[in-house]
Amino acid sequence: MLVHQAGILILQGLSGAVFGILLFYLLGSLLTRRWIRIDLYQLLLSMAVAFLIAIVCEVYLGKLYQLLTGKPLWQYRVWPIHDGYTSVLNFIVWPVYGYYCYVLHHILHARQISIRPAWLKGLVSGFDGPLLEILANGFFLLFYGTFYFYYLPDDMRHFTSIQVVPLYMVMGVILTLVLDYLRERPRRWHYPAGFYLAGVGFVLAG
């Protein structure tokens, strides 16, 4: 029974991931006016690094928020772990954020838009992160009748919250700096493999 339920939840996560990947690819191709050509190494690197950094940041920044305010900012509703600060399904979902970052990087490069210093680009996550959360929660509510995660403040109808913006900025700066560093390193497949496996280990530790 537990295996069956886990299988259903994993399929739900995969459906959301496929939806996000298709949406971001089509929007990116539309904005660049040509089909985006995928560099498999750079794509997998972006997805793996985003997975590890995002899942660690959401747990520890979430705990820091609770330490400072006395209450949590969000709680996962689907397969929660690490005291509800993240979900087992994020081994599927968070890499899609890395896919989004890859597409965004491609769009900026195609349009010859350079944001410097590099950390400034990371601050963008403070604005696009909450929008993507609304998309994720909207998908789960529409197709599965539940919030994927639930924000306790009701300033954004519990889909996300303005209060999460600075947390996304911190995570975005870390992610941008790490990715920029690794993109300039010689290609080594142990980078994406290592980051992804470390993220899976963090999930299993929850």
Model regions and ranges:
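Aromatic-rich, lipid-facing transmembrane alpha helices and their immediate juxtamembrane interface loops
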Residues: M1-G206
